[in-house]
A protein has these predicted regions:
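C-terminal secondary-structure termini that scaffold catalytic or DNA-interacting sites
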Residues: 1-3, 62, 186, 222, ...
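Well-ordered beta-strand positions in beta-sheet-rich domains
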Residues: 35-39, 175, 224, 258-260
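N-terminal core-binding DNA-recognition domain of tyrosine site-specific recombinases/integrases
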Residues: 38-42, 62-66, 70, 74-159, ...
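A short, charged, amphipathic alpha-helix used as a generic interaction element across diverse proteins
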Residues: 40-57
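Basic, Lys/Arg- and aromatic-enriched nucleic-acid-binding interface segment
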Residues: 132-140, 151-215, 220-221, 232, ...
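Short functional hotspots where side chains directly engage DNA or cofactors
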Residues: 160-162, 222-230, 326, 337, ...
């Protein structure tokens, strides 16, 4: 074995038919020398690899040639992700890794994962019939995980962030007409969830947001209510409980989603009536009542299961002659009706809790055609005459 060292290089030597090189990284906690090794067919190839490796080390990045993508993702899910996102989102990320990322990329070495590898995965998912939005979620999860690798200094770049992002076409859901909305409200009048449905329709609220409303968030004098929480059903990680899922009342994730709604006098009056009705239900329930401070609770005060609420709403919609509807369609309906009444797009965006007005525009921008036409006609009249 012959050992040679060139000017400005780390150690390079020939081992049989191949050339090998090593770079000194320092010492471990036991005082042992730590080196990073590379190999190639020619001395020049090894020298170039060492040069690139030295550049990464000088920048604070030390690639780990041993860890696989799956091992890294598992470590990220177990140690880095918890506490940074909602529990339901954490469950979704675990499922995305288990079902999509680990099977396709898991056996690859993390340091050798390329943009092409990731792009090929997205294409394979498209060929398998997955929607652009589903692939976008997969890309988001991988990008966030690899960002942790960058922070740790074991990745020089984020290949997921550099991969081709799928184009997602936002689609507007089915919406109620004014007449249908009135028919629904007439049908639900007097029902225990009439105010919940009114709020969901008037402000385009998600069902979890409606069910997460707290009495403490209602300002009776100002006539406002603050959205701060949402009710969701998530996986139960406590194996001793024997349950697969559990209900949680969690804080809304983003600053834009935590928002204040201005109530009409009619809605304030409806809420007062509901408050009185709930006080009577509390007395009737006696010791069974569990006070969570929720505006829309079960008959014993506990959080209402969103799926049960959906079932109740669907039955009421059918009773109103509308057929099968889902509560989320009240959100689309509320947004569409607000825009139809001339509410400015940025106001609708704030009421819906979108993170940016661009999202609102992508989903509901086509409803503004009449506004654009009116603006064009006004400008034409001002500039060119009637």
């Amino acid at each position: 074995m012959t050992k040679r060292r060139g000017s400005g290089e780390d150690s390079i030597y020939k081992d049989g038919e191949r050339w090998r090189g090593a770079i000194h990284l320092g010492y471990d906690d036991k005082g042992r020398r730590v080196r990073k090794k590379v190999s190639g067919r020619t001395r020049a190839e090894v020298a170039e690899k060492l040069r690139k490796l030295r550049k990464l080390v000088d920048a604070g990045t030390v690639p780990d040639d041993k860890i696989t993508v799956k091992a890294f993702l598992d470590r990220w899910l177990a140690h880095s992700l918890p506490g940074t996102v909602a529990e339901s989102t954490e469950d979704d990320y675990n499922d995305t890794v288990r079902l999509h990322l680990a099977p396709a990329l898991g056996r690859k070495k993390l340091a050798k994962l390329t943009v092409l590898d990731v792009d090929k995965l997205w294409q394979a998912k498209r060929d398998a019939g997955y929607s652009a939005n589903s692939i976008r979620i997969m890309r988001t999860v991988l990008r966030k995980a690899l960002t942790q690798g960058e922070r740790e200094g074991i990745l020089p770049r984020n290949v997921a962030a550099l991969s081709a992002a799928p184009h997602v076409v936002a689609k507007e859901g089915r919406t109620l007409t004014i007449d249908q909305a009135k028919a629904l409200l007439d049908t639900v009048a007097g029902h225990r969830f009439d105010v919940a449905i009114m709020l969901a329709l008037a402000y385009g609220l998600r069902r979890g947001e409606v069910l997460g409303l707290h009495w403490a968030a209602v300002d009776w004098d100002a006539g406002t209510v603050r959205l701060t929480h949402s009710v969701k059903r998530i996986k139960d990680r406590d194996k001793a409980s024997g349950r697969k899922t559990r209900l949680v009342v969690g804080e809304l994730k983003t600053p834009k989603s935590r928002r204040t709604l201005v109530l009409t006098p009619q809605l304030v009056a409806k809420l007062r009536t509901l408050h009185t009705r709930q006080a009577k239900a509390k007395i009737a329930a006696g010791e069974l009542w569990q006070d969570h401070g929720l505006v829309f609770a079960s008959e014993i005060g506990t959080p209402m299961d969103p799926d049960n609420f959906s079932h109740i709403f669907s039955k009421l919609a059918k009773r109103a002659g509308l057929g099968h509807w889902h509560p989320h369609e009240l959100r689309h309906s509320g947004a569409s009706l607000m825009l139809a009444q001339g509410t400015p797009l940025h106001v609708v965006s704030e009421i819906l809790g979108h993170t940016s007005i661009a999202i609102t525009k992508d989903v509901y921008g086509h409803l503004l055609v009449d506004d654009k036409r009116a603006a064009a006609e006004a400008m034409s009249g001002a500039l060119f005459g009637a």
